[in-house]
From Swiss-Prot:
It comes from Lactococcus lactis subsp. cremoris (strain SK11). Binds 1 Mg(2+) ion per subunit. The magnesium is bound as Mg-PRPP. This is Uracil phosphoribosyltransferase. PANTHER family: ADENINE PHOSPHORIBOSYLTRANSFERASE, URACIL PHOSPHORIBOSYLTRANSFERASE, CHLOROPLASTIC. Its cofactor is Mg(2+).
Amino acid sequence: MSKFQVVEHPLIQHKLSILRRKEASTKEFRELVDEIGMLMAYEVSRDLPLEDVEIETPVQKTTVKQIAGKKLAIVPILRAGIGMVDGILKLIPAARVGHIGMYRDEETLKPVEYLVKLPADIADRQIFLVDPMLATGGSAILAVDSLKKRNSKAENIKFVCLVAAPEGVKALQEAHPDIEIYTAALDEKLNEHGYIVPGLGDAGDRLFGTK
């Protein structure tokens, strides 16, 4: 399977079309990010391994399948990534949640890491690294750097976003060609201000009602 995938499920595409609209309220935007995050998790988890286990139903003993192997961790890139967490937890309620916080240096325009709070056993977990936007790729690259420094293996990291720019995809693939990238849409380009076009605006501001 390709390391880059656009998830074209009809429900995801329909909800994304509503999410993009400038008239969407903070409440609507928040709910849609939550819902699309959950649907993306369904697609991204499609290849998780299964194992046979024996259980007892009210009628008899039987063999069923359950997810095997590594436990899961959801790691949002703050702040906008927080909006995707609850939707994923609805599908995977036992997942641990870590946080990686970034801000943009106004002089260099580069991301600066200010917070890393991860499960102690993060190196042994399958990781969904989430952020609604993949614009320049700078924050995603730095977040993957942080995970790898803590001994997370590339094959255990999946970056999940809602909208990506070609520039961000290219930058992340060049820096970390060994991780998988999933997006609901690959947009046209970045504009001169670093916004994805046509995009959906500033995801953090629209999620939290700030400017």
